[in-house]
Amino acid sequence: MKVLKFGAAWCTPCKMLQHIIDGIDSDVPIESVDIDEESERAMQYAVRGVPTLVMLDDTGTEIKRNVGVLTRDKLLEWLK
């Protein structure tokens, strides 16, 4: 399982979410994807807004997603 975190350098909420991610301890790997640098990948996952988190199972199938900033506690719950 892994999480793709779609964001952009100009996105203030993305920076807020990254700060929260940096402050947690999780066994789930979180890969950052810049929508400006990897627009095709963002289109592949139908990202309509940032920040967007997409959780994938081991086969690459989407399990769930979240659009917007989460609190630390909500993020930890979402990662379960």
Spans of features found by a protein language model:
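Local sequence-structure signature of Cys/Sec-based thiol-disulfide redox active-site neighborhoods
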Residues: 1-24
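Structural micro-motif
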Residues: 45-54
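Mobile acidic interaction elements
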Residues: 12-13, 22, 39, 45, ...
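Non-catalytic, surface beta->alpha helical segment in thiol-disulfide oxidoreductase systems
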Residues: 55-80
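Thiol-based oxidoreductase modules, predominantly thioredoxin-like and allied folds used
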Residues: 5-6, 25-40
